[in-house]
Amino acid sequence: MPLASRLFLRHARALALAVLAACVWASWGGSRLEVDDQPTSIIRSDDAAFAQMEEVFEQFGSDDGTCLLLLEGSDPFTPAGAAGLRRVTDALTGLEGLVAGVTSLLDLRDPLGRPLVPEPEAGPERFAAARERARLHPLAADKLLGSDGTTNLVLAQLADETLPVAELRTRVRAIEAALEEPSSTQPWTVSLTGVPPLRVQIFDAIRREQVVLSLLAGLVGAAISFAVFRRLAPVLITSAASLVSAWWALGVMGAAGETINLLNAALPVLVLVIALTDGMHLMIAILRRREEGADPHRAGAHAIRSLGRACMLTSLTTAIGFASLAVSDIEVIRRFGLVFAGAVGLTFLAVVTVVPLLGSAFLKRAPSGSPALHGAGLARPFELLARAVVVRSRMVTAVGTLLTLGMAALSLQMVPDNRLTEAVPHDHGAARSLERMEAVFGGSVETSILVEYEDEQRGLDAMVAVHEALEREPFASGALSIVDVLRSLPGQGTPQAAALGLLPEALTRSLVRRDLRRALVRFRVPDEGAAVAEPGYARIQEALEGVEGEHPGVALHLTGTGFVARRNVNLIIEDFALGLWVAALTIVLVLAVAFRSLRLGLLSVVPNAFPLAVAGSVLTALDLELQVSSVLAFTVCLGIAVDDTIHLVSRYREERDRGRAPEEAAVRAVTAVGRALVITTLVLVGGWAMLLLSEVPTTQLFGLIGLVGLT
């Protein structure tokens, strides 16, 4: 890039002022950034299922705003158990403005209209009779009372169901504080679980670790860089360029009105990795030129002239490749692709300006030379390796291609998977409580069946059939609908539509909307992976189709957060994984055009695809799920592979333009670029390894795949 090099030589001060102005502007943009921690933002789509779920929430209320209190070792049908249950519910109802409603066994009535749970002063016979009635009560068994008889649930519905995590945290903490007194005075345990506390624990764990792990990764990477460069200035300069890249990217996101969500929150890490790679190449070129006697300013200009084109191609091809994600049907992926493409372009500008500018200011002392970096100690092994490969080029190409194809085929066996607790540390209270709840109640993830009917009685008859189908299905448990409410009334056998008029609308609004001729059948499913969940939902869907056929005028639809979120997150993973392969192929085409050689473009397929194939095959071999964190790690692998490939091919073309034979050009390219590749890889691997120390399973998976792809 001769023009950019001359611009740097003649107008370095103006360039520095422009960089400072861009940083100020990025600070303004970054100050406008907001975090979108709404649970439905990442699963939002334009399809009918999501629109139907939102409509159901508007009509019946959300299904993910309920805290579940698991009371274990407490028989509510004893004087002590009944008194303890009442203390728990009283503590929750006292949280006015935070908790909208509390549901427990205390709200149920027996056929005579008496409380199902007697007062603590009642005699043993009364409690024994109540225990037997509860076992058969349609609103108690497997819904509020566990199969063991000593575990029961209390449901605390939060006021204002759709809340950001900050507000959720306040309410969860208030519930925990309110439960301290009734929990401490009882021999049984009270634990809090459900979607709100799980969400709070996930965000808190990730936020806490972001600071600690980022600091550790930075320190390890800096230590490795210092060991290689043997000087502090090159380490600080390359680190500063990477940080400025992330800074600018966040600034543009804020200025454009983009919000931080669970997907694009990883963008700063991806930008840092790409910036560090290019920054290392530039720094090594500058130091090498300084050892040859050039002053810092001219050394920086030479680095821009010799490597600027390769850095630009790296950014251009990566940006075009990820911009191809804009064709996705899922909004969050479309936006991620466009934002990432823009961020990569800014990364190029930051690296090719910040590294030379800081080098001019802080590399004035003549380098003493690092044998590991500049001498023959590291160059000789690369030369020997390159010559060995060149001699056996056909065999190496064939073996590499076959390995890539084989591992890619193995990677295709991966299936997308997601669970409610996949990002929750296994030893955290809410996750452990959820596991115990599933063992006793059969499930924890709420799903719903929307029942649309023309005639009320036909609708009730269809709901009875749905209940019978769910009772036969091992994947479902705890089905609840207006049918159960009607069955709990005195003298009710087969639910009759006429009895609906006896029920207060305020108590049944979450189950039936007579004005809309709609009702819900709510049930729970276990928080299992795709191997269990997908067949389970398929069997339920098949059963619903059978019920529809037997009840004309009735339509049944699976809905709810548990069902729609699983499906849409899986679609995100599938679309993202496919988009990465499309991006890889797009990058190949761009390279072919940039180097004016279809052959070089095709030759870059294997080195670009190899890290993805290796990481995918390792994931398959370890029987690990393909999650959102997995595809983000694949993004890192692709970005690094493209960067390394372009720098190597660019140097090869440069050697060929000097008249060297293909074999000699390849050897010299590997010898010259290989050192930078090794140094960059060592720094990234050292920092990335710190992610394995995380207590968050998805972060550990992200770190594992990144390490495999980088090495």
Residue ranges and their predicted role:
Residues 1-228, 232-233, 374-577, 581:
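Feature of extramembrane
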